[in-house]
């Protein structure tokens, strides 16, 4: 008996910008495997950066103009023209240009009117500025996903396939639905085994998907759709494989796809900013025993990397070497610390006040050192800590990690340390828990890439 299995698949923005290849490599690759797949799509590459702010550099987008009450309507119209050009480029792929331009053009005009109304309400001073700005941010974010999802369904329909645009953005829908309720409501009359579904990566809900997840919202939508609809597998299509190291640092010829790992390893990666998937999106999948498959959209013959709950590598090995050079070592030295119960609790309370989570922590009799993100090492934090403790310093450093589902073998830590020493790299601090999934080395920032190459060469080759 042929049992129908549903897969929910996320396609990122960079991949969406190469949509003709996505059609060939993913959507229509196997004529016998077209349906039973729901695609959660991001905006085309760079569009959400223009709408909100650049994800990496922080360069302001339209949202910032609205927040500062500058000329956002002009920028919205410039963006509309850019989207019209993008639509034009998709005509050879099958896009109906008139329908596509009417759709996004109407939504941009409506968005400008809504933002103007918000502007007037903000000026009145009668409502919470924070709440209204969040609503404006979500409104803008939704435009990018609506555009790409509508276009995708339109293209497939014009190529002769039954396809459905699933709009989770809640535009012109005044019902007060939670995110889960909107997903259920939107899919209740859709049979994904008879139509190709393209759903927006943004979902409108009373709790505000960006309030907690901000730019990670599309992965949260992806996760929730997979759980609520009972998917057998959740697939993420990226422009690259999840590999044993960064090809730009280690070299393309020296790395390899991971192929299999577990959710614990995925958590370790997220902790240093190398997100295989947003940790708050992966948890519901892990709890519901839905495996995640990470695939390269442009290497369709490779099965990708499967992340499951219980996978343990059959032989002990390091699966990934990664890290971050955008971290600081926050060090608190205090002679009163020795033997005092709860001393570090006071430090944690100050970090919690500033909403800071640390990546790694090392202690001795009178010193506690934590690795935190550079952006969190603020003068305000240091001043608060300095008021309570004897000596507080913050030093720019790098963290390099050797991670695997099965690295608990005698000598592996020594081998890692020796590889760094052989390359004249001084270890400033080292950390590993008895669970033995992540060896963390703190090194001088200038030796970040060098340390990764040394560890990868010793542990992953």
Question: Locations of the language-model features?
Answer:
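Conserved H-loop
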Residues: 42, 297, 363
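Positions that flank functional sites
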Residues: 171, 241-242, 300, 366, ...
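Short hydrophobic alpha-helical runs that function as membrane-insertion/retention elements
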Residues: 233-237, 292-294, 359-360
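A conserved active-site cap/scaffold subdomain adjacent to cofactor or substrate pockets
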Residues: 262-336
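A conserved regulatory-domain signal marking ACT and ACT-like small-molecule sensing domains
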Residues: 303-461
């Amino acid at each position: 008996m042929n049992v129908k299995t549903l897969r929910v698949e996320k396609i990122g923005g960079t991949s969406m910008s190469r949509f003709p290849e996505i059609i060939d490599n993913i959507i229509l690759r196997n004529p016998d495997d077209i349906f039973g797949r729901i695609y959660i799509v991001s905006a085309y590459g760079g569009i959400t950066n223009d709408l909100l702010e650049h994800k990496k550099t922080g360069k302001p987008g339209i949202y910032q103009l609205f927040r500062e009450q500058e000329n956002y309507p002009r920028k919205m119209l410039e963006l509309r023209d850019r989207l019209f050009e993008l639509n034009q480029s998709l005509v050879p792929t099958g896009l109906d240009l008139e329908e596509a331009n009417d759709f996004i053009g109407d939504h941009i005009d409506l968005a400008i009117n809504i933002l103007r109304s918000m502007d007037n309400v903000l000026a009145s001073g009668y409502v919470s500025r924070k709440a209204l700005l969040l609503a404006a941010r979500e409104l803008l974010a939704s435009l990018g996903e609506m555009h790409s999802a509508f276009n995708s369904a339109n293209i497939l329909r014009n190529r002769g396939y039954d396809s459905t645009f699933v709009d989770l953005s809640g535009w012109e829908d005044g019902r007060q639905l939670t995110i889960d309720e909107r997903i259920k409501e939107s899919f209740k009359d859709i049979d994904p085994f008879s139509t190709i579904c393209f759903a927006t990566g943004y979902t409108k809900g009373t709790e505000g998907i960006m309030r907690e997840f901000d730019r990670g919202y599309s992965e949260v939508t992806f996760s929730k759709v997979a759980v609520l609809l009972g998917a057998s597998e959740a697939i993420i299509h990226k422009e690259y494989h999840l590999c044993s190291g960064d090809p730009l640092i280690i070299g393309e010829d020296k790395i390899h796809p991971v192929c299999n790992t577990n959710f614990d390893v995925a958590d370790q990666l997220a902790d240093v900013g190398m997100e295989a998937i947003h940790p708050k999106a992966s948890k519901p999948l892990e709890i519901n025993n839905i495996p995640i498959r990470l695939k390269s959209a442009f290497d369709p013959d490779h099965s990708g990397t499967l992340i499951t709950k219980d996978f343990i590598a059959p032989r002990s090995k390091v699966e990934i070497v990664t890290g971050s050079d955008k971290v600081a070592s926050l060090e608190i030295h205090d002679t009163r610390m020795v033997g005092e119960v709860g001393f570090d609790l006071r430090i944690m309370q100050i970090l919690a006040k500033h909403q800071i989570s640390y990546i790694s922590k090392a202690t001795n009799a009178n010193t506690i050192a934590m690795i935190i993100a550079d952006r969190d090492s603020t003068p305000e934090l240091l001043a608060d800590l300095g008021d309570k403790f004897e000596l507080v310093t913050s030093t720019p450093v790098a963290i390099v990690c050797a991670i695997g589902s099965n690295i608990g073998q005698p000598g592996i830590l020594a081998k890692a340390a020796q590889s760094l020493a052989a390359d004249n790299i001084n270890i400033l601090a080292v950390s590993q828990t008895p669970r033995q999934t992540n060896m963390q080395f703190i090194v001088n920032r200038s030796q970040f890439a060098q340390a990764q190459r040394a560890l990868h060469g010793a542990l992953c080759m």
